[in-house]
């Protein structure tokens, strides 16, 4: 089939590459975001999908919006059978949804209807979900509410971060798109989503990623993993922010000094090789932290430089 591919970040590139490699399909064009100005000299830099499209010899439609103008016209004149979306990051207006013969399909990284929205992986980990996955569904006007063609489920490990899980799904979920296109060619109808169990996964706001030291250790650990590596959970010590990048919840049988076991919420306790944070439930080990503008380092190394003592508390 003749395809339009819409995507922007690294996570979308494996699907684009797989579609180009499939002789049954022709990727006629890529829809992506305009080049971003980066660095001191504000040099334009293409996004990962635009760069991949250039390397693959595929024309790119770079548009801030496709509600009207050249981007809109380019899509309507493409004569596509299907448009495939993976992390495009822009809205598709209602009039364009019907332009491809078989509409638009989207690879979404959650088990719909759970976690509709822009940050499904992050929100799943932050909520403490034990599993998530990916699905391919038909785009409709309502947010991530269209019927589903294909679904896969993956466990969320106790140490898994959002970045690691997203990278995994970017590759393992790609076959779902190929299978969904096979379904479309075969005339298979997608399955409507359940009206029950709908949750929303809004973009991560800076206030969402501040560590609340009175929260339970598991809740803080979920937050840290859910927003790692970016934007990163943060806390404040002596008026200065620092990121907490890796944590570990203590397990039964972990031997810790009494000063660690009795740490109060917000209290930092450093041993020779470890750093712990008192929480609303039990101590949490801080495995990796990063002062703003500095490199990431182990919690113990950071504690030595920060001169942590028995009275040190986070705000």
UniProtKB/Swiss-Prot annotation:
Q: Catalysed reaction per UniProt?
A: L-methionyl-tRNA(fMet) + (6R)-10-formyltetrahydrofolate = N-formyl-L-methionyl-tRNA(fMet) + (6S)-5,6,7,8-tetrahydrofolate + H(+)
* Enzyme Commission number(s) of this protein: 2.1.2.9
Is Iron-sulfur among the key words of this record?
A: no
Residues that bind (6S)-5,6,7,8-tetrahydrofolate: 110-113
* An annotated GO cellular component: cytosol
Top-level taxon of origin = Bacteria
Q: Which InterPro entries match?
A: Fmt, Formyl_trans_C, Formyl_transf_N, Formyl_transf_N_sf, Formyl_transferase-like_C_sf, Met-tRNA-FMT_C, Met-tRNA-FMT_N
Which PANTHER family does this UniProt record tie to the protein?
METHIONYL-TRNA FORMYLTRANSFERASE, METHIONYL-TRNA FORMYLTRANSFERASE, MITOCHONDRIAL
Give the function comment from the record.
Answer: Attaches a formyl group to the free amino group of methionyl-tRNA(fMet). The formyl group appears to play a dual role in the initiator identity of N-formylmethionyl-tRNA by promoting its recognition by IF2 and preventing the misappropriation of this tRNA by the elongation apparatus.
| Protein name from the UniProt record | Methionyl-tRNA formyltransferase
**Organism per entry:** Cutibacterium acnes (strain DSM 16379 / KPA171202) (Propionibacterium acnes)
